[in-house]
Amino acid sequence: MEKVSIVCFFFFLLFGSGYGGLPPFWRATVVTMTNLIGGPPLTIHCKSKQDDLGIHVVPFKQEYHFKFQPNLWKSTLFFCSFQWDSQFKSFDIYDAQRDQGICDDCQWEIKPDGPCRLGKKAKCFPWK
C-alpha cells in the first residue's frame, strides 16, 4: 500500500498540481515585448491553442508581457498579431521548438521590419 501511495503522490506532483498539468517546480516563462515601431501605439493580440490573452494597446517604448508554463512536449506556441497605422503583421512570439532552452525570460523588441529577440542567441526575424 505504501508503494501505491508514493506512486500516486509522484503522479500528483508531476501532473495534477501545476498550470497545464505541470508540476509546481516547473519554471514559468515570461515573454516581454517592447514597442519600437517608431511613434504610433502598437496593438498586440496574443493567443495559444488554450488561451486568448486579449487585446493590448502599447505606447511607443512601453512594454507588454505575459507569463506561462511551457508543456513537457516542447509544443507550446503563442502567436501574436501586431497592428499599427495601416500595418497588420503576425508572428509566433513563443515557439517551444525555437525558444525553449534559449530563454525563460524572453525579451523582444517589436520593430517595423520584424521582431528581434534579445539576450543569448539574439536574432531578428521577418514577419509571418
Curated annotation (Swiss-Prot):
GO process terms (BP): rejection of self pollen
Keywords linked to the UniProt accession: Secreted, Self-incompatibility, Signal
GO cellular component, one term: extracellular region
Pfam families: Self-incomp_S1
Localization per record: Secreted
Originating organism: Arabidopsis thaliana
Main location: secreted
Highest rank taxon of the organism: Eukaryota
Transmembrane regions listed in the UniProt entry: none
Keyword Secreted included in the entry's annotation: yes
Lineage, top ranks: Eukaryota, Viridiplantae, Streptophyta, Embryophyta, Tracheophyta
InterPro entries: Self-incomp_S1 (IPR010264)
Family label: Belongs to the plant self-incompatibility (S1) protein family.
Residues in the signal sequence: 1-20
Name under which the protein is recorded: S-protein homolog 5
